Amino acid sequence: METSGEDGSAINHSELFSQLVNKDGQMNDTVASFLYYMFPRELFIRALSLIESCNMFIYVLVPSGVNDKNNQPLKFLEVSDLVNSIYDDSELHRLIVKPSDEDVPTYVDLNNWMCSCQEYTDLMLERLNQMEAGSLASSLLKDIDDSQRFQEDRFAQLDAHSLSMQRYVHCEKLNCPHLLAYSILLRSSTRTLQHFLEKGQILLIQINNMDEWLKLHINVVE
């Protein structure tokens, strides 16, 4: 998270992501071009292709309850409520990319900036091999402990709920299409996520049963 503008100020990736799709549902070509040149290895194009592939799943755990009046299960949350719960971190959610039944699914964890894909693993190993002194954390992380310098950017941010410190991953050192694609969806604005949901390119699935939730994790591990 070292990217800076011409005046030396930090770029707010979340703000850029939120402007990628305008209010008319059209791609903002100016913002898209800027993001294309911002990320190496054609990461932005690969992330957009991933979003358009219809292979990205967002699972949300909403524990089932019972309506005391008629003893009936509570209804599923509306899509807008699910989207808000993801942005508020009020419900557990899991991000999984699964191209086909034969392919191994890719597990993505934005909160801890981790991905199970080979590209992410290779970059992590490369950083480990390049280290001469110090720790991996000092090489990959940037801490901001001065509240006057706190940023609104949520992209590649860890410990997002801390009141005393902001911690970011140096995304120019450790990034992959899966992390970037989900960041565009979940570290921008609810309107951006709603746009791709309405186009049917992102699958948002509510899970009410804890057993099904645990099976989901087991399947990813397998």
From Swiss-Prot:
Family statement drawn from the similarity comment of this UniProt entry: Belongs to the SHU2 family.
Sequence intervals crossing the membrane: none
Compartment(s) of residence: Nucleus
Keyword vocabulary terms for this entry: DNA damage, DNA recombination, DNA repair, Nucleus
Main function: Plays a role in a RAD51/RAD54-dependent homologous recombination repair (HRR) pathway to repair MMS-induced lesions during S-phase. Required for error-free repair of spontaneous and induced DNA lesions to protect the genome from mutation.
Single biological process term from Gene Ontology: DNA recombination
The keyword DNA repair belongs to this UniProt entry's keyword annotation: yes
Name the UniProt record assigns to this protein: Suppressor of hydroxyurea sensitivity protein 2
Principal location: nucleus
GO CC annotation terms, alphabetical: nucleus
